[in-house]
Every structure is written in structure tokens, then in C-alpha cells.
Amino acid sequence: MNKFIIIFLASVCSNLTFSADKVKGLGLSKCTTFNSVAIEEKVIYMSWVAGFITSQNIFKDKLHAKNITYNMSQSWLESFCYKNPNIIFERAVNKFIFEFTK
């Protein structure tokens, strides 16, 4: 039984380590998809953005963007995605992070 627990814990911990840099979910959709969803559904995308930025804070550098509102974030991402419709959404969010945490 103890061997089973040790193997189980080792596999769970190793999966967490190897999956830390993998993007999942809405981040894999293209910018054109983000721009085409209804306003009510953009809340889901912006929730993904908040989670992604949080993960960047945990795994990489501490990000401190000041005076950035929810509406400003959404508007910036909409504008960027309008200009770059074929880029995946995660890259747009990375660009947003780069622009506002200089």
C-alpha cells in the first residue's frame, strides 16, 4: 500500500511540474474568436486572462501593472486581436503583459 501511495504522489507531482508551461483552454483559440464572441461571453475570456496573469506571477516574474482597469484590459485586447486576428489568444495576453509591465 505504501508503494502505491508513493508512486501515486510522484506521478501527480511530476505532472504538475511538466504541465506548468502548457497553455490550455481559451488561450489556444485565435484572436478572431475572442473578437467575435458576445460581450457577455468576453467575461469568460477575461477570467482566463486573470488566471493566466496569476500563473505568470507564480511561475515567472512578479508582474505589477498599475492603473489598469478591467475595461482597459478588454479594450486593449480587442484592439490587438482586431489587428492580429490569426494570433492565438495566449500570445495576445503575453503582449498585453509585456506592454503594461514595463
Predicted regions, residues:
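Surface-exposed, polar helix/loop patches in the mature regions of secreted/periplasmic/lumenal proteins
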Residues: 74-102
